[in-house]
Amino acid sequence: MEVPRLDHALNSPTSPCEEVIKNLSLEAIQLCDRDGNKSQDSGIAEMEELPVPRNIKISNITCDSFKISWEMDSKSKDRITHYFIDLNKKENKNSNKFKHKDVPTKLVAKAVPLPMTVRGHWFLSPRTEYTVAVQTASKQVDGDYVVSEWSEIIEFCTADYSKVHLTQLLEKAEVIAGRMLKFSVFYRNQHKEYFDYIREHHGNAMQPSVKDNSGSHGSPISGKLEGIFFSCSTEFNTGKPPQDSPYGRYRFEIAAEKLFNPNTNLYFGDFYCMYTAYHYVILVIAPVGSPGDEFCKQRLPQLNSQDNKFLTCREEDGMLVYHHAQDVILEVIYTDPVGLSLGTVAEITGHQLMSLSTANAKKDPSCKTCNISVGR
């Protein structure tokens, strides 16, 4: 059941019930606040005989849809023509403010067999907590409604992007990836204190940590996947890593074949921007059969390491040759520990450009290049 968009351009912020949008078998209507249980609109009357929904159950949750069902007494059940569904983000469940963002969504659906699917990327975001309550209603010949009491309030959380959604992001990223440039090392910038700590407390090996919440809000790796962040960008004129970095003046460099080789798998993780012209692609490299590999295999689209638009490893004349996409900034996550003895640590000669950091960066939800038609 597709739910039509609720127009934010309400005629009167104090009279939300005036706005009704109809779409064949389904209608979306902005009702008054749930407080007091009854809607105050003059076109909706009370009728105690209508059954109140109880034991509400939410199932089949995705990033932008869910199924809802409930139980109700058979008394007057045949008089029900519509269901009123009050859906709000959890943090706004007691709010009746009509802003451009996070407008509470009240829906009216024709009474259909349960469970009923509620779908709509314009009011459902991934990985977000919501509250939902339901009324039963009977539409009268004059257009008025008689309604039941509101049900209890149920809470649920939407899901992450699925592989299908990530594949859509992948396809959009491929469009702008550009030509491939040769490279030979992965690198990771940090402060000197970071590397000192690794040597003293972690046996000279960098340890995976949980990825932050940068990028798409629905990305299944944010706050869940453990890994170590690397870059592989090169300067166009030198073919070497740039001397500037937003992450620290000390750089660990490691030969590309130490991290990316036939014994690893490559996955697409995300595609985003931060209100700038730069676009970022997150890739994950995981040793075959490792915990990180199993995590990604269940959640992320796998890429052909020898043939993709972002990062390749091919054998030429008995040697592994590496290329990266020119027109996107790659953020590479390696899912296993990496010993400092496998590479070198040295101070860079450039600047620490903090403004370019993507730590916990929020994705621009309005960018047409890197967004898909599901919750942002």
Curated annotation (Swiss-Prot):
Glycosylation sites per record: 23, 37
Domain of life: Eukaryota
Pfam families documented for this protein: fn3 (PF00041), PHYHIP_C (PF19281)
Intrachain disulfide bonds: none
Record-linked PROSITE patterns: FN3
GO CC annotations, alphabetized: cytoplasm
Domain Fibronectin type-III: 52-161
Keyword tags: Glycoprotein, Phosphoprotein
Residue(s) carrying Phosphoserine: 12, 15, 25
Record's keyword annotation contains Glycoprotein: yes
InterPro entries: FN3_dom, FN3_sf, Ig-like_fold, PHYHIP/PHYHIPL, PHYIP/PHIPL_C
Entry-linked SUPFAM superfamilies: Fibronectin type III
Biological role: May play a role in the development of the central system.
Family: Belongs to the PHYHIP family.
Protein name, as recorded: Phytanoyl-CoA hydroxylase interacting protein-like
